[in-house]
């Protein structure tokens, strides 16, 4: 089996592709897998570290308005299509899978024109521009959220698979998680995470909670992100950081921290939501503003509408508001249980298996 995977720009596009590659290797150890990305995207570092070869094509993002930049981008796109054609013809894949980002455009388009089986995976509720364009060309469209169905025209191509995540999120037990994070207090644990790079506004809201409200009805475990750790820690009054509250730059055992918490406060990236719902945790989602096509707000609202999360817009966030929302949830065990049940219902714990099955079905189709 020979497979090309293409996805890039951000971790949200790259990690699902790596999960799919790992599942293929698990089922077919001799499978030949090649990634196609861009040299200036995160994939140029992440993919080789994961142990997979990668080749690069030329691509540039498009602005929503007519501009000189778009003229240049169109020229680069034509070059990228030619480069993708050369790579695909040399590698001779059985199937080409795209996981989003502008790099998928030339790769999946050319694969479809060459008569090769194609599939794209969409991580967010509101699909990215590239995947919306590829809708007409590809054979199958795998969705992480059922709510995304309404944004695609070719309904017969759609299948809800979920977003693949690390298996250890499902493997960690409550006992193991509690042994690491609930040894020194019986108070409810609130995990606050702003994503791999941290979230400045979320960190500031938690600092405000610690300095002004000094909560004693719950414990805070704040993961600031390495870049924001020092400045965040320096903003917290010494007396506010009681022994029951913890501040870390990063945690290496997120599956344990997530399993141990009673409530998680986080941004609304697709992978984060997939992890939270896989273990069925109640959440307060704070979608990051100014993301591509505001996709985090769509993700957050989908969870909020199903009762799995409470949503706070980033421009409305403050320590006072966050503290009140935390207490409203944590203070009512029935609310927590109801949110946990809704969250677990939305979780898809076998996403990689589902995507692999769809890939196999495409390959077996005559």
Curated annotation (Swiss-Prot):
Pfam families: Glyco_tran_28_C (PF04101), Glyco_transf_28 (PF03033). The keyword Isomerase does not apply. It is found in: Cell membrane. Its EC number is 2.4.1.227. Pathway: Cell wall biogenesis; peptidoglycan biosynthesis. Belongs to the glycosyltransferase 28 family. MurG subfamily. Cell wall formation. Catalyzes the transfer of a GlcNAc subunit on undecaprenyl-pyrophosphoryl-MurNAc-pentapeptide (lipid intermediate I) to form undecaprenyl-pyrophosphoryl-MurNAc-(pentapeptide)GlcNAc (lipid intermediate II). This is UDP-N-acetylglucosamine--N-acetylmuramyl-(pentapeptide) pyrophosphoryl-undecaprenol N-acetylglucosamine transferase. The gene is murG.
């Amino acid at each position: 089996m020979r497979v090309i995977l293409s996805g890039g720009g951000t971790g949200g596009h790259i990690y699902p592709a790596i999960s799919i590659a790992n599942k293929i290797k698990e089922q077919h150890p001799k499978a030949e897998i090649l990634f196609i990305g861009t040299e200036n995207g995160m994939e140029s570092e992440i993919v080789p570290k994961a142990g997979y070869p990668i080749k690069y094509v030329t691509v540039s993002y498009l602005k929503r308005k007519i501009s000189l930049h778009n003229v240049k981008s169109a020229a680069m796109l034509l070059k990228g299509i030619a480069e993708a054609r050369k790579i695909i013809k040399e590698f001779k894949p059985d199937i080409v899978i795209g996981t989003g980002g502008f790099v998928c455009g030339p790769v999946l388009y050319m694969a479809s024109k060459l008569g090769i089986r194609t599939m794209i995976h969409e991580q967010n509720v509101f699909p990215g521009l590239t995947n919306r364009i590829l809708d007409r060309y590809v054979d199958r469209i795998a969705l992480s959220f059922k709510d995304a169905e309404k944004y695609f025209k070719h309904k017969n191509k759609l299948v809800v698979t979920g977003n693949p995540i690390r298996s250890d999120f499902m493997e960690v037990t409550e006992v193991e998680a509690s042994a690491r994070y609930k040894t020194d207090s019986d108070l409810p644990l609130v995990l606050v995470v702003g994503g791999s790079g941290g979230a400045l506004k979320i960190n500031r809201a938690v600092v405000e909670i610690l300095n002004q409200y000094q909560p004693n009805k719950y414990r805070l475990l704040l993961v600031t992100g390495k870049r924001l750790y020092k400045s965040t820690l320096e903003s917290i009054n010494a007396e506010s950081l009681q022994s029951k509250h913890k501040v870390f730059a990063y945690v290496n055992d997120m599956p344990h921290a997530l399993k141990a918490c009673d409530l998680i406060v986080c941004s609304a990236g697709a992978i984060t939501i997939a992890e939270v719902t896989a273990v069925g945790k109640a959440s307060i989602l704070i979608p990051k503003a100014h993301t591509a096509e505001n996709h985090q707000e769509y993700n957050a609202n989908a969870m909020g509408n199903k009762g799995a999360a409470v949503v706070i817009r980033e421009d409305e966030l403050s320590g006072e508001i966050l503290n009140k929302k935390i207490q409203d949830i944590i203070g009512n065990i029935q609310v927590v249980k109801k949110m946990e049940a809704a969250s677990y219902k939305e979780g898809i714990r076998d996403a990689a298996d589902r995507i692999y099955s769809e890939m196999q079905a495409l390959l077996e189709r005559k």
